[in-house]
UniProtKB/Swiss-Prot annotation:
Belongs to the class-II aminoacyl-tRNA synthetase family. It holds the Pfam family DALR_1. This is Glycine--tRNA ligase beta subunit. InterPro entries: DALR_anticod-bd (IPR008909), Gly-tRNA-synth_bsu (IPR015944), Gly-tRNA-synth_heterodimer (IPR006194). GO terms for biological process: arginyl-tRNA aminoacylation; glycyl-tRNA aminoacylation.
Length: 721
């Protein structure tokens, strides 16, 4: 079967857009082909800085004929109805229609319509111009003389050529001709911009990839990443060093080169006095270079690794020299930031009021930056006040949390006040991703305790599902306060995540709270925390506080479900223990854990079956309005199975309640498991719907006791199986 090759070659595409753009091309083209009636065996996308490529294998040469039956009016319908049917069906005469009989509706006309298939070349030529014109680039531009013409092509960078060939594996391929803004599809591409700029005639993908490889273009981005990684590790090893891995940078650099050549540069060792994080970010952000270190060392070496797109005749000496000059200049700036951040700010007398508000020591650089942050009234959010106001809220909430975490109150207060101070440092101004990290370093330099310094860095954590979770009580208190203030604040102003939109990363903040609580085994009722946070916000409409708390707790429940499911918990078991007002997340998780162990055991499965049977019978009778006794009357028992079940429920309920009071949910489940045999015996020996109304009502009340007993730990009706 034929293969289709498409290449869209342009000037340099931003690295961050390449992977998605290639995926978009694949989806748009394959969707259009399938919609037009073509099928294919496989498709794969490729990309380089200058081209998007699509290789489709086993594409049908022609779409199949389509047959359709279109129902028309009855044969005795008026002329107007018949004429409308003929027009809609594309028939020239009613004699071309068929007559079908329906026993109920009588005879009616049916048109048998055949839509002839189309050649694949025709379909491709038909769909490609619109795909290119409407391509979903996040940013695009017009170029050339046609750019002034309304409706002219927009592309991420000027589009230069289009390749579109089609043909079976052992046959000659054809060019599928179509045109977009004067660019005509052909079988001609071009190699590396500098090493092989000549035209190259290609047929199908294998031929295309081979010829581009000879023209110093590695078409496969994953292969470019492998080359860069292997060569970088090798050159580092050869110099007695190891590469500091950076997957994000590797992805970006692979999108900057078509023919990767790995080189090593260096800078003066004196710059190693700058924190490693600043060195790494300076070199990464400005020069897209990797850093190295001695094997097993924490600190960096003065060697960096760069990736060139050119195979230089001098072995890359000039490239290394040029990059080294820029790296040194950037590190010189970084050293300046680092030094200035440790010095005094000017006009300290203007910061006295802010210093007094937060108990700051203006002899210390980090305290000065916090005072400056407050004095400048830097906005956190238009509806949530300034950064200074936010720090005051975090301090208040962290103080309340310290009573629960057992953290030292003075350390918590100090860490909360300094947590955002590094936002006014020059290092964080240059590299925002260093917030917290630089605060920790400056805190250590000015003599803060380890607990305070660590909390300044760790209060942003965890920032994702795999990030480190702080365990020190001071860090946990400030981290929880920071995230809860954010969540309560944005809920209070009705800025909540919707669908895929979460501009303030509130889902991540909620996950952070969940991980801090569960992984730290913290008993932290959320609703009182919401109350403290809401009180600090000074809402204009206090009545809305209850709505905010309820909605936010429901949001936490949703995120907790996702988190527990990711850990392997069953969704129905989570639902079974999750009451609407449950705000102790650790207790919810422990109940799910205990219920999971119980339900997977034979006793649990059998009790579940019996409990669900009891619940279903009771629910059905309640729905019909059947009388259910308010309480069980032992005098109405007629069978030993009734007496045994009643006595067993009392013992199991007492045992379960006592275990729950001790927060021993496994023992609570074990207590309930003793109901299995009495429940089985009851349903084997007892007819619930007895003819005597009083006995029936009493037996239904007994079923209600089963439901109530198991309901102490979970709503068994929500458990599947």
């Amino acid at each position: 079967m034929p293969d289709l090759l498409i290449e869209l070659r342009s000037e340099e595409i931003p690295a961050r857009m390449q992977r998605k753009a290639a995926g978009d091309l694949k989806k748009l083209v394959t969707d259009a082909l399938v919609e037009a009636g073509l099928t294919y065996e496989g498709a794969r996308e490729y990309w380089t800085p200058r081209r998007l490529t699509l290789d489709i294998r086993g594409l049908n040469a022609r779409s199949a004929d389509m047959r359709e039956e279109r129902k028309g009016p009855r044969i005795d319908a008026n002329d107007k109805a018949i004429e409308g049917f003929l027009r809609a069906a594309g028939l020239s005469s009613i004699s071309e229609a068929h007559v079908h009989n329906d026993p109920k509706k009588g005879d009616f006309y049916v048109a048998h319509i055949v839509r002839r298939g189309r050649e694949a070349e025709e379909i491709v030529a038909d769909v490609m111009p619109a795909i290119i014109r409407d391509f979903p680039w996040p940013k695009s531009m017009r170029s050339g003389a046609a750019s002034a013409i309304p409706g002219s092509l927009r592309w991420v960078r000027p589009l230069q050529s289009i390749v579109c060939t089609f043909g079976a594996e052992h046959d000659e391929t054809k060019v599928i001709p179509f045109e977009v803004d004067g660019i005509v599809a052909s079988n001609i591409t071009y190699g590396h911009r500098f090493h092989a700029p000549e035209a190259i005639a290609v047929r199908r993908f294998a031929d295309y990839a081979e010829k581009l490889g000879k023209a110093k273009v590695v078409i496969d981005a994953e292969r470019r990443k492998e080359i860069i990684s292997a060569d970088a590790h090798n050159i580092a090893f050869a110099n007695g060093l190891e590469l500091v891995e950076d997957e994000g940078l590797l992805e970006e650099v692979a999108g900057l080169v078509e023919w990767p050549k790995v080189l090593m540069g260096s800078f003066e060792e004196s710059y190693l006095a700058i924190p490693s994080e600043i060195i790494r970010l300076t070199i990464k952000t400005n020069q897209k270079c990797f850093v190295t270190r001695k094997p097993g060392a924490e600190t960096l070496s003065n060697r960096f690794i760069l990736v060139s797109n050119i195979e230089a005749k001098d072995g890359g000496k000039e490239i290394v020299h040029g990059n080294g000059k820029v790296v040194r200049a950037r590190l010189s700036d970084a050293a300046h930031f680092w030094k200035r951040d440790q010095g005094d700010l000017p006009d300290l007398e203007t910061l006295a009021a802010s210093a007094g508000k937060f108990g700051l020591d203006l002899k210390k650089p980090l305290d000065q930056r916090m005072a400056k942050l407050d004095a400048l009234n830097v906005t956190f959010h238009a509806k949530l006040g300034t950064q200074g106001e936010r720090v005051a809220r975090i301090r208040s909430l962290a103080a309340a949390l310290a009573k629960i975490t057992g953290a030292d109150p003075a350390s918590v207060a100090r860490a909360a006040v300094l947590a955002k101070a590094d936002l006014r440092t020059e290092a964080v101004g240059e590299f925002p991703e260093l917030q917290g990290i630089m605060g920790h370093k400056y805190a250590v330099l000015q003599g803060e305790s380890a607990a305070v310094a660590n909390a300044i860095e760790d209060h942003y954590k965890p920032q994702g599902p795999s990030d480190h979770v702080p365990t020190d009580p001071v860090s946990v208190s400030v981290a929880l306060a920071d995230k809860l203030d954010t969540l309560v604040g944005f809920w209070a102003i009705d800025e909540r995540p919707t669908g895929s939109k979460d501009p303030y990363a509130l889902r991540r903040a909620a996950l952070g709270v969940i991980r801090l609580i569960l992984e730290g085994r913290a008993r932290l009722p959320l609703l009182p925390c919401f109350d403290v946070a809401l009180a600090s916000l000074k809402l204009q409409r206090p009545a809305m506080a209850a709505d905010v708390s309820g909605d936010l707790l429901a949001f936490f429940h949703d995120r907790l479900k996702v988190y527990l499911r990711d850990l392997g918990a069953r969704h129905d078991l989570i639902d079974a223990v999750l009451a609407p007002d449950a705000d102790d997340l650790l207790m919810i998780a422990r109940r799910v854990e205990a219920l999971t162990a119980f339900i997977t055991a034979e006793e649990g499965r059998n009790l579940l079956a019996g409990t669900k049977r009891a619940t279903q019978i009771l629910a059905a009778e309640e729905k019909k309005g059947t009388e259910v006794a308010a309480s069980v009357d032992e005098e109405l028992f007629r069978l030993d199975a009734e007496r045994l079940l009643y006595a067993s429920i009392k013992v199991a309920s007492d045992g379960a309640r006592a275990a729950i009071a001790k927060e021993d949910f496994r023992s609570a489940m074990e207590a309930l498991s003793k109901l299995r045999e009495p429940v089985d015996a009851f349903f084997n020996d007892v007819l619930v719907n007895d003819e005597d109304k009083a006995i029936r009502a009493n037996r239904l009340a007994l079923l209600g006791l089963i439901r109530s007993a198991t309901g102490e730990v979970a709503d068994f009706s929500k458990i599947s199986g």
